[in-house]
Structure formats: C-alpha cells, structure tokens
Regions:
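Short beta-strand-initiation
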Residues: 8, 50-52, 208-210
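Short, His- and charge-rich active-site/binding loops that engage polyanionic ligands
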Residues: 51-129
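Short linear interaction motif-like sites in intrinsically disordered regions of transcription factors
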Residues: 12, 67, 86-87, 148, ...
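Domain-level detector of nuclease and nuclease-like folds
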Residues: 105-272
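Bacterial N-terminal signal peptides that target proteins for export
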Residues: 2-12
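N-terminal signal peptide c-region/cleavage motif recognized by signal peptidases
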Residues: 20-21
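N-terminal module-boundary/linker segments of secreted carbohydrate-active enzymes
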Residues: 24-65, 70-73, 260-271
Length: 272
C-alpha cells in the first residue's frame, strides 16, 4: 500500500510526442528519467509513459527505440510466477496493429512446434518466439501493482534468447541488488540497429547489439551486448562507455545530465 500511495500520485500514463515538453515556460519532468528522457531519432516517434517505464516507439514499424525506468528498493520483487503475455500499447496513437500475439495471460509458454506459430508480428516487425524479451525487467517492478504494464509491446524487443537469459539477465540482477545500497537507479536500455536497417521494416532486420546504461544521478555505468553473445558470457565483459553507446545509436540518453563513466559504479555492480 505504501508503494501504491507513493507512486500513483507521481506517475501518470499518457502518450506524448516528446518526453519533456514546455507549457507556459514550465518543463514537465518524467520521473522515469534522470532530469529528462532520452532523445528520439525523429519527431514523429512516440513516447509512451506508463507507471513503471517510458518507451520511445517508431510508429511506422513498431520498433522500440529505447525504454527508461527508475528502480527503487521497494519496487523489486520475485517475478518467477508472474504470468507473461504480450498486448498492444493502447497509449500509442498509431496503435500496434497486426500483432498476432498471445493475448491470454498464462504461466506456460505457447506451443511453437508448428512452424507457422514460431513468428510473431509487431506492426511490421517479425521475430521468433524465443527471441523476444522485455527491455524493462519484471523483477525490478514485481513488488508493484503495475507489473502487468511490462507485458506491453512497447517493452518488447528482439532480444536473442541466449544473450537475454545469460549476460543481460545477469546485469538486471546486479542492478536490482545494487538498489539496496544505492537508490534510486535510472536505467536506459534499447537496441543498436545497423545503419542499413534503421527505419526499415524488413523481416530480416535485427539489432546488432543491445545496450543498458545505469546511473545513480552522478555516475554512469554502460554495457553493450553483442546480439550473438552465448548464454555463458558475463555482463562484466560487456562494459562500454556512455559516449560509445550514444555514438552508435546517435541519441543523447541523458541529455540534461552531466555524467561520468565511473569504474566504482561498475565495481559496485560486481565487476572487479
């Protein structure tokens, strides 16, 4: 109840074209983001704001450009028994049509033995069932009443299973554990698309890599995951820099914050 009372007042689900807008010379700040949310690659992209995360979506393709979220100690919980399903984000003006996805919550993944059921369509993006995952992890918000929002397509990306269940998941766990001593933590995550495939909707287009950047408000730790990483790879071997990742995605991820890549923050995540 304490969590609900604390956060229901501060967070509101709306859909904006920009993460921060100025109305009568006043700036609206989004609590998911540090000072302000990341840039978007085009003015037509939509930013969908929910109780536990914000997401930038390319309306023509349904691609998620980035997600941003803030983790607090009281938001973290056990997510192993929470049902997983996919549903369209109703806050997006363009919708996420033609999403032939499982609509009923359940604890068991659907049978994908039939080849016709092995692909799911999100707008014009198609991805194999095993290569879809949540950019914002359920574990970070399992203790809140808003965890079902993480089943929306605006939180889905083509995360390869081997990478997602290995080093990517390991970093999520390390971030959650760090909130016990450092909170809040601000996280931005998303895909790194090749320059040839950006803005296109070809079935063969896949992200070359995925990034996750975490900040305590002053320091930043950046990680870049090659899409072909095996499950036994460790997230500590994927340490990058904020400048490197921003250069690859051509976006400012923390546009109104002065942050330094910090070895101590990386070490606090378990990387010596």
């Amino acid at each position: 109840m304490r969590f609900t009372q604390k956060f229901s007042i501060r967070w509101v689900s709306v859909c904006l074209l920009m993460a921060a807008v100025r109305i009568s010379a006043q700036e609206i700040n989004i609590s998911h983001c540090l000072n302000s949310c990341p840039d978007v690659s085009r003015p037509t992209n939509e930013v969908s704001l929910h109780h536990v995360f914000a997401a930038a979506v390319i309306p023509e393709t349904g691609e998620v450009e980035w997600v941003a979220y803030r983790i607090l100690p009281e938001s973290i919980g056990i997510a192993s028994l929470l049902p997983r399903w996919w549903e369209a984000d109703r806050l997006l003006r363009g919708g996420q049509r033609d999403a032939a996805l499982e609509q009923t919550p359940g604890f068991v993944q659907p049978d994908i033995s039939n080849a016709q059921d092995r692909e799911y369509r999100t707008g014009e993006i198609r991805m194999a069932a095993e290569d879809r995952g949540r950019l914002t992890p359920m574990t970070s918000f399992a203790a809140t009443p808003y965890w079902p929002e993480l089943n929306q397509l605006s939180n889905m990306s083509g995360l390869p299973q081997s990478m997602r269940t290995g080093p990517w998941s390991g970093l999520d766990q390390a971030i959650n554990e760090l909130t016990a001593v450092v909170a809040p933590l601000y996280v931005v995550a998303g895909p790194v698309m090749s320059h040839q495939s950006k803005g296109r909707s070809s079935e063969s287009d896949r992200a070359d890599a995925f990034y996750k950047v975490v900040s305590d408000g002053q320091r930043v730790a950046a990680f870049l995951f090659d899409a072909n990483l095996p499950p036994h790879a460790h997230f500590c071997a994927q340490v990058s820099t904020l400048a490197e990742i921003e250069g690859q995605v051509s976006l400012a991820l923390f546009p109104d914050a002065e942050l330094d890549d910090d070895a101590e923050l990386v070490a606090a995540l378990g990387c010596s």
